[in-house]
Structure formats: structure tokens, C-alpha cells
Amino acid sequence: MNKKLILCAAFLVAAVANTFACTNLIVGKNASADGSTIVSYSADSYGLFGELYHYPAATYKKGTLLDVYEWDTGKYLGKIEQARQTYNVIGNMNEFQVTIGETTFGGRPELADSTGIIDYGSLIYIGLQRSRTAREAIKIMTDLVQQLSLIHISE
């Protein structure tokens, strides 16, 4: 009995331990009462207060550069080539219903690349602005990481 009580107490402590990950709630059409698909995202950080971002669709001239700022801090990271066409994004979903959430966490410091000019937040929103499908978003984001190096250690 004591072993079960101790194990249960340890589990409860672990369950409520302080973490710095974000939260996603995803409900598929077969799990909702009316067949709706529901996606919710929260940046569970004390410094991020859940703004609803909007990036309007646009067409750009060839050679246009995009300033990249770190999503968490607003720190300028560098410039990348802008796509010729971008799509409307509100929150974490674009006009084609491509939706991206994240649940990041602390990572190993030796994996950080101080020369990187893209962070996870920029990847999310650039991926959404440039993609019509989830597969396309994944390709765009992985190509950007390969070309520019990811500045964060955990994502």
C-alpha cells in the first residue's frame, strides 16, 4: 500500500512540475460531437501573452528581402529572400487551413547555432505564409533550417 501511495504521489508531483513547454489542443472530426476539427495553441510562457498575429497575402517583386526577427524577443536576426507570393495567415492557420502549433522545451546548449538567422517562431509564420499544404509547409521549413541554421537549441 505504501509503495502505491509513494508512486502515486511521485506521479502527481511530476505531473504538476513547472515546465516551459507550450500547449496544443487538437480535436479531430471523429472526436468532436458535431464533426468539427478544433485546434488551439497557447504559448505558455510568462513573457508571451497570446497575440493574434495577422500576415495579409501579398505579391512581391523578385529579389525582395524579408527582415527576420526572433519571435520571442523581437531581436533582428537577418534577411532572407522573400517568396514571390505569400498567403493570408491569421493566428497559426493560413487561408488554406494549414495549421502549425508547437510544444517547445529547453534543449542542449551545444546544439545552439549563434550564427543562425531563423528561429522556430519565424519558421512557423514563414511556413504558413508560403504554403498551400502541410507537406509544402514541412518542405519550406526544413529547407530554411538547412540553408539558414536554426538559432534555438530545443526546437
Regions inferred by a protein language model and the residue ranges of each:
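N-terminal secretory signal peptides that target proteins for export/translocation
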Residues: 1-2
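Short, charged, surface-exposed loops that flank catalytic or proteolytic processing sites
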Residues: 130-138
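Sec-dependent N-terminal signal peptides
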Residues: 5-15
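A contiguous strand-loop segment
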Residues: 22-119, 140-154
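Second-shell loop/turn segments in exported
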Residues: 113, 122-131
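Sec/Tat signal peptide C-region and signal peptidase I cleavage site
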Residues: 16-21
